[in-house]
Amino acid sequence: MNDVRKILLRISYDGTRFCGWQKQVSGSRERAPSVQGELEKVAEKIHHQKIAVIGSGRTDSGVHAVGQAAHFCTPMRNILAYRFIPAFNSLLPHSIRITDAREVSSQLHARFSAVMRTYRYHLHCAPVAYAHELPYCWHIARMPDIHLLNQYAATLKGELDCTSFAAAGDKSASKSRYFYDTHFSFNHRVLTFEISANAFLWKMVRSLTGTLLHCEKKRCSVREFVRILHAKDRRLQGPPHRRMGYSYGTSVTPNTYSVQNRNTLARELASTGNARWKTY
């Protein structure tokens, strides 16, 4: 194992044509194109052997990424880590780009060392949406009350049981997740919902976004939203957000995730603002 190096990648992709990050294999064949599948095909071409590419987490179909982390182990000793950037990009479809590559400790794991995942949903708020924005924004023909939405969002902090926003098929052993930051912002017709947590349940962000907007449209009080959150009853969800219009980023640390890391990261987020979108 001493002859194997671990390389950490930063990846951006347009997820429109992909079933998500993770491969979906039937027998020996991939059922639908995936981001992981495309990366592993290229890694195999570069190394002339099968190479596993491990991502920081799964994403739903149609999710775009600006900074997802993934790692692979390479037996190549003489290539500098940054040279994997053009090596991969010359063979990948244009919808997937490697934006950074660096050698890391063998103890770092893209999934288990990840301290935070961030989703951004983009909603185009206008009577008519621009055609070129439709693949990347959810169109709603009204302007929601951003003040009320942020009042709801302010209740999503710290460790919370997210059963109310879990999908029917979610198989997570624990439904608790740790929220770092949740807020709405508005800029040039686009309302953005940003949520950062240690991890998410399957389709949880879609369900949560839909519930927030459903509550805002009904003019629910903050207390009513909190009641849904703590009910642990997914039947109280609002209609889920459609799949398009959201992007994903990951922050990783050389240390395995711990409560101590949580508290440190929460303090750092409060003082660094957009720095939370840096991958490493």
UniProtKB/Swiss-Prot annotation:
GO terms for molecular function: RNA binding; tRNA pseudouridine(38-40) synthase activity. Homodimer. InterPro entries: PsdUridine_synth_cat_dom_sf, PsdUridine_synth_TruA, PsdUridine_synth_TruA_a/b_dom, PsdUridine_synth_TruA_C, TruA/RsuA/RluB/E/F_N. It catalyses: uridine(38/39/40) in tRNA = pseudouridine(38/39/40) in tRNA. Belongs to the tRNA pseudouridine synthase TruA family. The keyword Cytoplasm does not apply. Its EC number is 5.4.99.12. This is tRNA pseudouridine synthase A. The lineage of its organism: Bacteria, Pseudomonadati, Spirochaetota, Spirochaetia, Spirochaetales. Formation of pseudouridine at positions 38, 39 and 40 in the anticodon stem and loop of transfer RNAs. One of its GO terms (biological process) is tRNA pseudouridine synthesis. The keyword Protease does not apply. It holds the Pfam family PseudoU_synth_1.
